[in-house]
């Protein structure tokens, strides 16, 4: 049948209006604060320049949720890294000392804040979010602004005073020394963290990083040097296993001049493994880095830690030959466990154009640490 007319294009809804008074109130709170923290969520994605300008002008230590990683470079002196369940240990303690939270585009989810009533108990809250339903849903803000983050910052930044906040930065540094977050086996490309570091050494910041969902996702969030907005594509909220490879394909189609690296686990990869055919048919420069622990790692970890070793339906009794599967789809393959020089082999296959599977075996007993147990406060972390 024939369609005579195309449906009308969707129109972008007008950004919500907000009051000048709320901006003045927010600025006054920031200027008066002694221990403020900037708390970024995925809703800041379209405001990277102004977010950084605010942080640097007011010298705000800045923490990010999983969805906001890269908004400040990993090594930026104001970056506290990720907060929450698998966040930076010192960051969870630093937040408890805050007297003001400036929350931009974040929703106070339980993975980020842990036990609600014990999260930042002494901090006033400024909350900016375009979704009215998020304002006051979990934590009651002292100033709530429903608006686009970039629009708010355009008016807020001129009213914010430049301050050194030397005492606060000294306390932050002291807590970071007291509660370090070590990265074990950081130089071993056959270990979880070492593999992530080795992959990062093969590319520059133009590379796009996608992940599936599981332990590999958390390890990558902790260790990969994410240094720019939109470098990082991952599934928060619903935590969709199988997200990584299709996301990598989309990123490669939209950015044919960039390397695209997809970190995945064996459980997640099998959710959408047929999309290897799409990557192969289009000869997309997508490299799948498969951390294969023959288990559903996060499920295995939760059961091992909190259910008296009662691991159930979390391991694969039969071995799956991902190398043969990938080759059958037409991908290049590399098993780093069989390479005399894993780093050199990794560099070589990443440098080659086209899709490839890079396979590394990971011990199923490896854990993502630190970890905030379910229902606990962020300061009740377990693990190394």
Where are the language model's segments positioned?
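Gly-rich Lys/Arg/Thr-decorated short loops/hinges at beta-loop-alpha junctions or inter-strand turns
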Residues: 1-13, 73-75, 173-183, 230-231, ...
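Active-site diphosphate/adenylate-binding microenvironment
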Residues: 173-252, 370
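Thiamine diphosphate
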Residues: 38, 90-101, 105-109, 218-296
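Conserved thiamine diphosphate
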Residues: 97, 152, 304-345
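Glycine-rich phosphate/diphosphate-binding loops that line cofactor/substrate pockets in enzymes
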Residues: 22-36, 54, 95-98, 198-207, ...
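Glycine-rich, acidic loop regions that bind phosphate or pyrophosphate groups
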Residues: 68-171
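Short internal beta-strands
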Residues: 60-67, 126-129, 288-291
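Glycine/aspartate-rich loop-and-adjacent alpha/beta segment that forms the canonical ThDP
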Residues: 1-17, 112, 342-384
């Amino acid at each position: 049948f024939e369609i005579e007319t195309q449906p009308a294009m969707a129109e972008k809804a007008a950004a919500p209006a907000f009051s000048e008074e709320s901006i003045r109130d927010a600025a006054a709170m920031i200027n008066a604060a002694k221990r403020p923290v900037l708390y970024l969520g995925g809703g800041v994605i379209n405001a990277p320049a102004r977010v950084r300008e605010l942080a640097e002008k007011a010298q705000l230590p800045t923490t990010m949720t999983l969805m906001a990683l890269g908004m400040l470079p990993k090594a930026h002196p104001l970056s506290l890294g990720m907060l929450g369940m698998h966040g930076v240990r010192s960051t969870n303690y630093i937040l408890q000392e805050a007297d003001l939270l400036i929350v931009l585009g974040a929703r106070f989810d339980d993975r980020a804040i842990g036990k609600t009533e014990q999260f930042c108990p002494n901090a006033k809250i400024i909350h900016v979010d375009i979704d009215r339903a998020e304002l006051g849903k979990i934590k009651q803000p002292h100033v709530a602004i429903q608006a686009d983050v970039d629009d708010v910052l355009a008016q807020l930044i001129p009213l914010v005073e430049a301050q050194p906040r030397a005492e606060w930065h000294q306390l932050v540094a002291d807590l970071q020394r007291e509660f370090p977050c070590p990265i074990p086996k950081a130089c071993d490309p056959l270990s979880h963290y070492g593999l992530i570091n080795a992959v990062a050494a093969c590319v520059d910041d133009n590379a796009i990083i996608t992940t599936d969902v599981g332990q590999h996702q958390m390890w990558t969030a902790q260790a990969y040097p994410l240094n720019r907005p939109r470098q990082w594509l991952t599934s928060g909220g619903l935590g969709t296993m199988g997200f990584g490879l299709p996301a990598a394909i989309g990123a490669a189609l939209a950015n044919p001049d960039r390397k695209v690296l997809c970190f995945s686990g064996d459980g997640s990869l099998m959710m959408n493994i047929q999309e290897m055919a799409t990557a192969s048919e289009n000869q997309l420069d997508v490299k799948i880095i498969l951390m294969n622990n023959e288990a559903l790692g996060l499920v295995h970890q939760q059961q091992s830690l909190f259910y008296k070793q009662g691991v159930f339906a979390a391991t694969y009794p039969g071995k799956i030959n991902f190398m043969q599967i990938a080759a059958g789809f037409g991908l290049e393959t590399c098993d780093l466990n069989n390479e005399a020089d894993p780093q050199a082999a990794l560099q070589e296959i990443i440098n080659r154009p086209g899709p490839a599977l890079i396979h590394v075996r990971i011990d199923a007993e490896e854990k993502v640490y630190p970890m905030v147990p379910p229902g606990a406060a962020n300061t009740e972390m377990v693990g190394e």
